[in-house]
């Protein structure tokens, strides 16, 4: 961790990291014999402030980062200079922890009124945000650009996350509205992430973080069955009893946020189209570029981390 700074506020955490190896990695036991590593670990555990480690190659840095994560068993963020470095470090850390996650930077808007972001990128960012909101001790790699970008507050993401179970009583139209409010696009057929459709007595939805869409079948107002299905041939593959469905956008809008946006854009003639979309209950394509109008607080990825998280600047 050349010029690396590690900031921590150590507390005990009994929860095991998702994907964390329960057996001691032999490569970590090698570090246990190092006096320098022991001092680094003791400094972090003793809350003695930032620590610096110098003169290491990239493979050595990721080795130490993985070892620190294995000791801490709490969220750890590794910040790197660029997207290319993030992809490289993430790949190396996955050799130790296959469940390490990459938090990419949001794509830049084409112009003031156009904003295009791939569903895959949105999926990665929301999946990481959801794990941090739950308090999972996950290992996150992010370029500095991603760390500095504004985000919606964790409470907004949580508010628009739906946990759907068999036996749940809810009107199909009401559940469909919840999905649309969370940023899902209503289509005639559900074929890609972020889409939802109502077909007879069932709702098909392709969760933004899922590999396959889900068919929710109703008996009157009760969810009778839920089945994953192949988006290509629309055939069911396997049953499921519970599905967590994250919002399909990083900026789902509740009523108050929507009204704030309308009020802020009302006097701006060149945003008339966005204002009309908001009034109609939709989410403008360029909503993320207008995020400060909807969210007043300066929220970034750092606000998703608990106070005792480890933050490593890998330069």
Please report, for each region that a protein language model flagged, where it lies by residue.
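ASCE RecA-like P-loop NTPase motor cores
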Residues: 1-315
């Amino acid at each position: 961790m050349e010029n690396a700074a590690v900031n921590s506020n150590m507390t005990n955490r009994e929860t095991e990291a998702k994907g964390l190896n329960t057996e001691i990695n032999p490569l970590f036991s090698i570090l246990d014999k190092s006096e320098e590593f022991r001092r680094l670990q003791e400094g972090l555990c003793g809350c003695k402030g930032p620590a610096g480690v110098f003169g290491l190659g990239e493979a050595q840095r990721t080795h130490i980062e993985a070892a620190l994560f294995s000791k801490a068993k709490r969220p750890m963020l590794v910040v790197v200079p660029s997207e290319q470095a993030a992809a490289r470090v993430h790949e190396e850390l996955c050799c130790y922890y296959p469940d390490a996650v990459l938090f990419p930077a949001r794509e830049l808007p084409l112009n003031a009124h156009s904003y295009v972001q791939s569903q895959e990128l949105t999926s990665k960012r929301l999946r990481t945000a959801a794990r941090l909101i739950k308090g999972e001790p996950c290992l996150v790699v992010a370029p500095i650009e991603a760390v500095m970008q504004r985000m919606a507050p964790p409470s907004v993401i949580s508010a628009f996350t739906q946990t759907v179970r068999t036996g749940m009583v809810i009107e199909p139209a009401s559940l469909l509205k919840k999905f649309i409010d969370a940023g899902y696009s209503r289509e005639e057929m559900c074929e890609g992430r972020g889409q939802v459709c109502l077909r007879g007595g069932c709702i098909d939805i392709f969760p933004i973080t899922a590999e396959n869409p889900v068919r929710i079948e109703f008996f009157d107002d009760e969810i009778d069955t839920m089945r994953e299905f192949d988006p290509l041939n629309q055939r069911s593959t396997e049953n499921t009893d519970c599905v967590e469905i994250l919002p399909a956008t990083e900026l789902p809008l509740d009523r108050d946020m929507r009204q704030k946006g309308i009020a802020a854009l009302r006097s701006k003639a060149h945003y008339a189209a966005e204002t009309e979309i908001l009034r109609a209950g939709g989410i403008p394509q360029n909503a993320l570029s207008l995020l400060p109008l909807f969210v007043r607080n300066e929220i970034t990825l750092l606000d998703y981390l608990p106070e005792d998280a480890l933050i490593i600047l890998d330069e």
